[in-house]
């Protein structure tokens, strides 16, 4: 394990208040375990608050962000922020921010870094298979062309790691209607054997 990383459950703090027309409540990691990881999320929170202060308009805004650490071990430190935002009496807009730190890295790493050169091209078909499986099993209401959409919209920053595999997600209304939320698929590590540079 990176000597700067400490094991154990992540501790969070709640930042709440008002900025511009918005009431916000944000969960951020507390300082003390791995400063670059914590600084990243705190800067995301400050940026979000600055954006709220610059907003105009007559409607009140509510914004909540909940933090989830998904992996912390010898191989990676990974987590995400789920953000819910509502303007006036409209429905909630959902978004997600993720970050994965690898040993020796002081900043979040994009998806291609996980793979040996040239091996990442094997990932899109695995993601597509899982997305189509979601639709066929009825686990998530997705558009008929979700298989093509998931390939076009695969993004190097929309992922996080768990103990079981690589989770890839898509923004609201990209693969399905608003009610589908943030479609997420998990690719087990054993399906990527020989492709990954790190011993996940």
Describe the predicted segments one by one.
Residues 1-200:
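Compositionally biased intrinsically disordered regions enriched in Thr/Gly
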């Amino acid at each position: 394990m990176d000597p700067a990383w400490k094991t154990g459950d992540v501790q969070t703090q709640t930042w709440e208040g008002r900025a511009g027309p918005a009431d916000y409540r944000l969960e951020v990691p507390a300082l003390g375990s791995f400063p670059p990881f914590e600084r990243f999320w705190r800067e995301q929170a400050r940026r979000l608050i600055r954006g709220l202060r610059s907003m105009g308009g007559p409607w009140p805004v509510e914004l909540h962000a909940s933090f989830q650490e998904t992996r912390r071990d010898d191989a990676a430190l990974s987590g995400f922020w789920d953000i819910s935002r509502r303007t006036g009496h409209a429905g909630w807009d959902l978004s997600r921010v993720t970050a994965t730190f690898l040993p020796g890295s002081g900043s979040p790493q994009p998806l291609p870094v996980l793979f040996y050169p040239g091996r990442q091209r094997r990932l899109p078909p695995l993601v597509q298979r899982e997305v189509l499986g979601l639709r066929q099993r009825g686990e998530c209401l997705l558009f008929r062309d979700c298989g093509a959409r998931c390939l076009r919209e695969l993004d190097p920053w929309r992922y996080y790691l768990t103990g079981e595999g690589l989770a890839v997600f898509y923004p609201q209304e990209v693969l399905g209607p608003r009610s589908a939320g943030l479609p997420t698929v998990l690719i087990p590590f054993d399906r990527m054997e020989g492709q990954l540079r790190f011993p996940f």
